[in-house]
From Swiss-Prot:
This is Polymerase acidic protein. The lineage of its organism: Viruses, Riboviria, Orthornavirae, Negarnaviricota, Polyploviricotina. Belongs to the influenza viruses PA family. Keywords: Cap snatching, Endonuclease, Eukaryotic host gene expression shutoff by virus, Eukaryotic host transcription shutoff by virus, Host cytoplasm, Host gene expression shutoff by virus, Host nucleus, Host-virus interaction, Hydrolase, Inhibition of host RNA polymerase II by virus, Manganese, Metal-binding, Nuclease, Phosphoprotein. Its main location: host cell. InterPro entries: INFV_PA, PA/PA-X, PA/PA-X_sf. A motif (Nuclear localization signal 1 (NLS1)) lies at residues 124-139. GO terms for molecular function: endonuclease activity; metal ion binding; RNA binding.
Length: 716
């Protein structure tokens, strides 16, 4: 750091900083961060004053170097950088000639135009925190405070920034450059952290000896002693300060800070109404697969060939009939659509060579199901400007729905293990550095915990369906293309397996914009009888299409096989994100890594191996009405993965809003649990913002009910 300071700053500034440190008895070889901070502060003070002059008319003007008017009076008197005696002499002289009130502490500059002393601050923390500390130390309304940060933020008394924007921009740019230069040499983190104040010490026990010295060294800047700092913290009155700041913003704004106590928060109000329904793009726990092991047929890997091969494994087809109609749809059309798929697949099999893709005939039932010619005709705006009552359609408010138990069951199922592996261990080259070795060890442990997880199956299924649908939407825009819903996995014995879940038929797809919608009809196999939870299947028409022999504890039993049919839609941007669902694996791995890091820093060694191999240890996985649920590390991995996958499958504006707003309340509650005595204003407004997102989305409603469980246990 010392070398960097000597290279980065003007020699005059470096010399002044050395003198200052000597005067205060500090060793610049040891206190290198302080050395850098003093140089930075000096440079900002000089830049603040540079080029600013006062002309004969008493107006402030900016004059660049080398200008013939260099005899003009300087606008600012620089006090910072002088030795203490000289500095006080200058301050006294200014007070005598201008009648200014003498400050208690040495300021940095005097402004002859505004007739006030200026305290300049340069902080590595948040500007308002540093501003508060300065204001509290000076306790004088006469001295103007101006704080700059290394991130380009600034704060000044009464938002009066003294200088023009260009001059301030020069200072901010210089600070940003210093930060980048430090970062490129690996010095920034240490420099940034060296300014941090320690947390307040609550107990009033006497601190002596080494601990006392450490306490005094650990104080935030501008505090000479622990008592001084304690007095500041105890006497800090947020209401006055925050109200003052708000009153600068607007006369209408006011905010009383209310203490947030255990009794303050209430549970979130979940909506009443009919139970919520399934809205994912494909079936989850209710899906049924027709599978082939060790596929080696001709054209293996071509979706249509694979699908036909899977269909041939089932012999229990029967005349289909509707067992659960769609309330608002024309159900015979859904029935005819399935019959058409069967017939056209049969036609393909009768051909000599199976084609690689199949476009369905544009029958009336498919046109209806895919909304063909249903969109209102678009009219050019110029042609209807004169229409008097031109207005947008009135759209009904969404109907409120209540939480139903099926979504918790879906989540539980997603956390479970299946008997197949859905992802391969990445074949990655030799580790070069030790950190890579740790990273790949963690990845391998994590992969082995989640490779058989049902949530991982949903990822691979989602990636496949979205990729196939986006490809078809671009390659066959006008066609009703038949797209098999396929996934691939490995059995316990390591044999490859190809699975067919059903089919999608894509509608017209001239997708110009990211949000343009392509309609599709999905037809998915299932053994779930829809009559058990009809509310879950509100958007579906369900057919009974066959009987399947299932191996059970009492031998083979015959179960009816259903087909869940619905009209759905998606867009380019949704398909793009669907194709990237593998990111969920990365997100949950990072969450697990941060748990390992926390454990490792406590034990001061890498705890990866112990973390995954100590089977007796349990970890918190979430809240339920019973309290905090704990489980093995594998279950934690799978639960985190399932949450990430459901955030992707059930992505919606309601979820975005709920996540952002409930997080604020969560942080306040956590602050209360950590005894940080949080205060809030407009808590009612925050509740309103959260509850505005609780409308009808099953995943959001489930998260809200989990949040209520968390509130109950966090505050009991």
């Amino acid at each position: 750091m010392e070398d960097f300071v000597r290279q980065c700053f003007n020699p005059m500034i470096v010399e002044l900083a050395e003198k200052t440190m000597k005067e205060y008895g500090e060793d610049l070889k040891i206190e290198t961060n302080k050395f850098a901070a003093i140089c930075t502060h000096l440079e900002v003070c000089f830049m603040y004053s540079d080029f600013h002059f006062i002309n004969e008319q008493g107006e402030s003007i900016i004059v660049e170097l080398g200008d013939p008017n260099a005899l003009l009076k300087h606008r600012f008197e620089i006090i910072e950088g002088r030795d203490r005696t000289m500095a006080w002499t200058v301050v006294n002289s200014i007070c005598n000639t201008t009648g200014a009130e003498k400050p208690k502490f040495l300021p940095d500059l005097y402004d002859y135009k505004e007739n006030r002393f200026i305290e300049i601050g340069v902080t590595r923390r948040e500007v308002h925190i540093y501003y508060l500390e300065k204001a509290n130390k000076i306790k004088s309304e006469k001295t103007h405070i101006h704080i700059f940060s290394f991130t380009g933020e600034e704060m000044a008394t009464k938002a009066d920034y003294t200088l023009d924007e260009e001059s301030r921009a020069r200072i901010k740019t210089r600070l940003f450059t210093i930060r980048q230069e430090m970062a490129s040499r690996g010095l920034w983190d240490s420099f940034r952290q060296s300014e941090r104040g320690e947390e307040t010490i609550e107990e009033r026990f006497e601190i002596t000896g080494t601990m006392r010295k450490l306490a005094d060294q650990s104080l935030p800047p501008n505090f000479s002693s622990l008592e001084n700092f304690r007095a500041y913290v105890d006497g800090f009155e947020p209401n006055g300060y925050i109200e003052g700041k708000l009153s600068q913003m607007s006369k209408e704004v006011n905010a009383r800070i209310e203490p947030f106590l255990k009794t303050t928060p209430r549970p979130l109000r979940l909506p009443n109404g009919p139970p919520c329904s399934q809205r994912s793009k494909f079936l989850l726990m209710d899906a049924l697969k027709l599978s082939i092991e060790d596929p080696s047929h001709e054209g293996e890997g071509i979706p249509l060939y694979d699908a036909i091969k899977c269909m041939r494994t089932f012999f229990g087809w029967k005349e289909p009939n509707v067992v659960k109609p769609h309330e608002k749809g024309i159900n015979p059309n859904y029935l005819l659509s399935w019959k058409q798929v069967l017939a056209e697949l049969q036609d393909i099999e009768n051909e000599e060579k199976i084609p690689k893709t199949k476009n369905m005939k544009k029958t009336s039932q498919l046109k209806w199901a895919l909304g063909e010619n249903m969109a209102p005709e678009k009219v050019d705006f110029d042609d209807c400007k004169d229409v008097g009552d031109l207005k947008q359609y009135d759209s009904d408010k969404p109907e409120l729905r209540s939480l139903a138990s099926w979504i918790q069951n879906e989540f539980n199922k997603a956390c479970e293990l299946t008997d197949s592996s859905w992802i391969e261990l990445d074949e990655i080259g030799e580790d070069v550095a030790p950190i890579e070795h740790i990273a790949s060890m963690r990845r391998n442990y994590f992969t082995s915990e989640v490779s058989h997880c049902r949530a991982t199956e949903y990822i691979m299924k989602g990636v496949y369906i979205n990729t196939a649908l986006l490809n078809a939407s671009c390659a066959a825009m006008d066609d009703f293309q038949l797209i098999p819903m396929i996934s691939k996995c490995r059995t316990k014995e390591g044999r490859r397996k190809t699975n067919l879940y059903g089919f999608i038929i894509k509608g017209r797809s001239h997708l110009r914009n990211d949000t343009d919608v392509v309609n599709f009809v999905s037809m998915e196999f299932s053994l779930t009888d829809p009559r058990l939870e009809p509310h879950k299947w509100e958007k579906y028409c369900v057919l009974e299409i066959g009987d399947m022999l299932i191996r059970s504890a009492i031998g083979q039993v015959s179960r009816p096989m259903f087909l869940y049919v619905r009209t759905n839609g998606t867009s380019k941007i949704k398909m793009k994100w669907g194709m990237e669902m593998r990111r969920c694996l990365l997100q949950s791995l990072q969450q697990i890594e941060s748990m390992i890091e926390a454990e490792s820093s406590v034990k001061e060694k890498d705890m990866t191996k112990e973390f995954f191999e100590n089977k007796s240890e349990t970890w918190p996985i979430g809240e339920s009405p019973k309290g905090v649920e704990e489980s093995s590390i594998g279950k934690v991995c799978r639960t985190l993965l399932a949450k990430s996958v459901f955030n992707s499958l059930y992505a919606s504006p309601q979820l975005e809003g709920f996540s952002a707003e409930s997080r604020k309340l969560l942080l306040i509650v956590q602050a209360l649990r950590d005894n940080l005595e949080p205060g809030t204003f407009d808590l009612g407004g925050l509740y309103e913002a959260i509850e505005e997102c609780l409308i009808n989305d099953p995943w959001v409603l489930l998260n809200a009910s989990w949040f209520n469980s968390f509130l109950t246990h966090a505050l009991s």
